[in-house]
């Protein structure tokens, strides 16, 4: 029986923090499904198609190198429902600090009540990526700052292009 893990997020944009989580997650499963949440009330910087391309180009080589099958999808329902739909038994969540842990523990508890067969696995962020958030990356890029230390090279180029004036 293969272990399927779901790694959900908005990935707007993909950051080195996300990449760090994926590097750890591929060691825990045979198949990693990255699920991009589509929220009707939110206006993302990158389109769904752009985020799908970013996720695939950055994460798929990491999964392949680890011998882990990689898939990418989108979802607009409960994250736990998306996990059930792909047959996941693990939900991967990255943690930067105690604030993340407090928030994620609440969600993990609710998810486990709704779907007892799906277990949340917390991946602590490596020291070098702990301060990185997609929100801060977008803000820095929007103000013309250099985000190359926080995102993969292709993502940095996409951000630069997005904000070119």
UniProtKB/Swiss-Prot annotation:
Protein's UniProt keywords contain Cytoplasm: yes
Q: Where is this site: Transition state stabilizer?
A: 18
Q: Which reaction does it catalyse?
A: (R)-4'-phosphopantetheine + ATP + H(+) = 3'-dephospho-CoA + diphosphate
Classification via InterPro entries: Cyt_trans-like, PPAT, Rossmann-like_a/b/a_fold
Enzyme kind, highest EC tier:
transferase
Query: Which superkingdom, per the lineage?
Result: Bacteria
Q: Which GO terms describe its molecular function?
A: ATP binding; pantetheine-phosphate adenylyltransferase activity
Q: In which pathway does it act?
A: Cofactor biosynthesis; coenzyme A biosynthesis; CoA from (R)-pantothenate: step 4/5
Q: Which positions carry the signal peptide feature in this UniProt record?
A: none
Q: Does the keyword ATP-binding apply?
A: yes
- Cofactor(s) the protein requires to work: Mg(2+)
Q: For binding ATP, which residues are annotated in this chain's numbering? A: 10-11, 18, 94-96, 104, 129-135
Which GO cellular component terms are attached?
cytoplasm
- Residues involved in substrate binding: 10, 42, 79, 93
Q: List the disulfide bonds.
A: none
An example GO biological process term is: coenzyme A biosynthetic process
Function as written in the Swiss-Prot or TrEMBL entry: Reversibly transfers an adenylyl group from ATP to 4'-phosphopantetheine, yielding dephospho-CoA (dPCoA) and pyrophosphate.
Alphabetical list of PANTHER family matching this protein: PHOSPHOPANTETHEINE ADENYLYLTRANSFERASE (PTHR21342:SF1)
**Family per UniProt?**
Belongs to the bacterial CoaD family.
**Quaternary structure annotation from Swiss-Prot or TrEMBL:** Homohexamer.
Report the protein name in the record.
Answer: Phosphopantetheine adenylyltransferase
Q: What is the lineage of its organism?
A: Bacteria, Pseudomonadati, Pseudomonadota, Alphaproteobacteria, Hyphomicrobiales
């Amino acid at each position: 029986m293969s272990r399927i893990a779901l790694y959900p997020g908005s990935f707007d944009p993909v950051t080195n923090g996300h990449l760090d989580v994926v590097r750890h997650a591929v060691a825990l499963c045979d198949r990693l499904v990255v699920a991009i949440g589509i929220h009707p009330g939110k206006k993302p910087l990158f389109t769904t198609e752009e985020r799908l391309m970013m996720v695939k180009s950055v994460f798929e080589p990491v999964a392949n190198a680890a011998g882990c099958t990689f898939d990418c999808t989108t979802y607009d329902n409960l994250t736990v429902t998306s996990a059930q739909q792909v047959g996941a038994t693990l939900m991967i969540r990255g943690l930067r600090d105690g604030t993340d842990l407090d928030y994620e523990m609440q969600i993990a508890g609710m998810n486990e009540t709704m779907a007892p067969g799906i277990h949340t696995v917390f991946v602590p962020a490596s020291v070098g990526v702990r301060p990185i958030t997609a929100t801060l990356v977008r803000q820095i890029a929007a103000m013309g700052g250099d985000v190359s230390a926080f995102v993969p090279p292709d993502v940095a180029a996409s951000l630069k292009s997005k904000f070119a004036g």
